[in-house]
Structure formats: structure tokens, C-alpha cells
Amino acid sequence: GQDTAIVHLSANDGEAIENEIIYGSVSGLKSDEDGKALGGAVIGIFKTGTEEFTKENAIQTTTSADDGSFSFEKVPYGTWVIREIESPTGFVLSEEEIAVTVGKVDEVVEIELVNYFIKGNIELTKVDADYPDNKLTGAVFEVYADTNGNGEFDKDDKLCGEMTELEGGVYQMTELRYGKYFVREKTAPDGFVLDESVYGVSIEENGKTYTVENKAGVGFINDAQKGSLKIVKTSSDGKVEGFSFRVTSADGYDQTFKTDKNGEIFIEGLRIGEYPVSEVSDSASAGYILPADKQATVKTDSTTIVEMHNEFRDTPKTGDDFNLGLWVSLAAASVIGAGVLGFVGFKKKKKED
């Protein structure tokens, strides 16, 4: 066969040759959707192909500073993935995966990571306190941000705007950022009492709608504005007790009341509005001419007075009818008697002649 030639090479003065790993670095800036620096984000650098982005699986981890800056030092040669592990409070975890490649010694790769605010919605349903199935429209609600975060409504809190009224007495404000808010009723629906209290609500989960109530399990209730009605009864013969009066309204109110010994009826807690008042035709009012119906306007926190007068019917009594007949009979008898006596006297005188 052929002989193989052996060549001896000598390099580096006979010392072993070592390959040094190339290292670079990654630096970045963390900001929110408004472009403001964002600290407190935990960020990791991972091997490509990683499926679970946890601290345990990361090659390195770091936390963004208050000025939003972060960096990874001594990143080995190759391609890596940068991914957020924990978001700052109030922000949605970023699932963006940014690939970075270190290809030469001391190379610095710069990146930017953005976090978006947690945003939620607030909603309330306006309800009639007396009739919960009756949903109220026409209210105006203001929403304030708890700017100083003290949990108390004060002059420093910022007005975010007014809630939008949807159909069916539902009011809503959407896309509110993470934090605490206050809801205050600015204008009550017509005929209802304004709720002057302020109600707090916190946005904590992204995409969630939070319900504001002033009565748990019912909704945001309003009491109706109310007043009183007084009916005063008079009559030509002085009788006033026990007469019945009917009071109605367009919203379904329909009640009948009787006058007391003073001829009065006092009704409290009537919703403001128009109430027709009519006297009931019954045994108590049978001998009287009933008065015309009257319209009573009930106003907030006041008493409306309605006066109703009865005239007694002027009809002859049974005893008077008897006496009149008796007198007529007696008068007729007298006339007849006088005629008979005159006739007898006339005949007697003629006979004497």
C-alpha cells in the first residue's frame, strides 16, 4: 500500500488554543401606552422554542427601573427571546415575544416593550324604590377618578365625564383605566329625589364590568318625590262625617277614603302629580247634590287642600205632605158646608113668602 505522510505543525508555541464565547448585551426601555416610562416590570430572556415564560425557565431576569430602563448583560452568542414575566400593577401582561440576536463581541441590542393599562367598565341600573321593576330614565351620573388615591371624594378628584344612558334605565361608562373611581348622581329623573351620596368603585381586572348599586341586589334606587292631599268636606246642613271620596291618578293609584268627624281626609305619601277627586254616591250622600269632581295637584313636600261642598236636596217631607192634604180637605168641606146652609136658608125664606 501507500505510505501516509505525517506532518507535525506547531502553533501558539505549543500551547492549547482556546475559543472564547462571544457575549453581547440587551438593553431596553419599558413604557406605557402613553409613552411614559414604566418601572416594576419583570422581564426574562429565554431560549428560542420556550413555551412557558416563567422565572424558572429564564436564562436571566431583570426588573425595569423607575425610568423604564432594563438590561441583560453577558448574553451569549445566538438568538434569544425577550418576554415579560410579570406586569407592573395596573397593566395587562404583555405577551409580545421579541427575538434578539447577539452576533459579535460586545454587541448591544436595543429594544422597547410597551404595557397597556388594565381597563374595565362601570354600569348601573336606575330603579324606582317603590316599584323595582320600573326602570328610570333621564338621570345624569358623573364619574370621578380618585386622583390622590385616598379613597375619599374631594376637590382634587378629576371628573372623567358622564355615564352614557342605554335603553331600559341602564347607564354605563367604558374603557376606564385601572384604579378607584367615584360615581355621583348629578340629575335625578323627573319626579324623583336626587341621591346626594357618592359611591366608590374600583377597576381591577381587564375587560370586566363592575356594577354600582346604592341598594345591594336591587340597583341604584331613587325615591319618588311625594306630597300630601287634604280633602275638606262641608254641607248645607252641617253634616260632614262618613262621606266617601275616591282619589285616582294616571299611574294606577285608586283609593277610597271616608271623612272623619271634622269632615276631613288627610292622605300622606302621594307621588307628585295630578289626582282627580270625586265624591262617592252612596247611602251617606243620598240626600245631597254631589259636587263636581276636582283636580288636585300634589307638589313636593307640601299639602294640597281640596274643598268639597254638598247642598241638601230641598224636597217636601212626608209629614208636610199629610198636613197639606188635610188643610185642603178641610177647606173644601167648609166651602161645601157653606153652600148647603145657604141653599136651606133660601128655601125657608121662600116658603114664608
Description of each model-found segment:
Residues 1-353:
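Solvent-exposed loop/turn and edge beta-strand elements of beta-rich ligand-binding domains
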